[in-house]
């Protein structure tokens, strides 16, 4: 069993994010620690927004050593009138800073973490209510946030300046196609 990376299939994360996670996983990740040794790409919020509507991001709180303290799922994040506004889990309107770190679901995980995912997924399915089952998600940031609260993991945030892009809205597609074309033309991708 080897460390593994989890990403969203419909996102472009950038080259540096992959390099940083790979380097951490192959040179620093320590499976002998008494807690799960996890790493994640910490994107800059302003580099992860859609021009076509609100997005959901995990807002990251970190300590002075860039160890993740909490991931707070935040919804309907949009730039309006030069400000970035969003809704928290209680549906209250909040203002965010453009340079805040966010999770884009790019995680480096030790092999034994699969056991946590499996047992948690069984519990998630057992507790699903049929009336809203189609809208419920088994969110990795919430799982990791729970482990952080229980002091069962240490997560190192690896900051990346890469610009994320993905198709959150159908109107995003032409922008993504053009961005990927540009990456191909310049030899990045």
Where in the sequence are the language-model features?
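Short aromatic/hydrophobic "clamp" motif used to bind/position activated sugar donors
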Residues: 4-6
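Glycine-rich phosphate-binding loop signature in dinucleotide/nucleotide-binding domains
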Residues: 1-2, 32
């Amino acid at each position: 069993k080897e460390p593994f990376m989890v990403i969203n299939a419909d996102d472009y994360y950038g080259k540096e994010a992959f390099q940083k996670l790979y380097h951490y996983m192959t040179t620093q990740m320590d499976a002998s620690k008494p807690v799960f040794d996890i790493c994640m790409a910490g994107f800059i919020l302003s580099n992860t927004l859609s021009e076509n509507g609100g997005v959901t991001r995990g807002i990251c709180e970190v300590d002075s050593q860039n160890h993740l303290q909490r991931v707070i799922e935040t919804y309907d994040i949009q730039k309006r009138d030069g400000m970035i506004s969003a809704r928290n889990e209680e549906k209250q309107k909040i203002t965010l800073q453009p340079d805040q770190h966010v999770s884009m679901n790019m995680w480096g995980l030790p092999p034994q973490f699969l056991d946590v995912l499996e047992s948690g997924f069984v519990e998630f399915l057992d507790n699903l209510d049929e009336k809203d089952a189609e809208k419920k998600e088994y969110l990795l940031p919430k799982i990791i946030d729970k482990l952080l609260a229980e002091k069962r993991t240490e997560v190192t945030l690896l900051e990346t300046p890469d610009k994320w892009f993905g198709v959150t809205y159908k109107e995003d597609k032409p922008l993504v196609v053009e961005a990927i074309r540009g990456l191909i033309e310049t030899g990045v991708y």
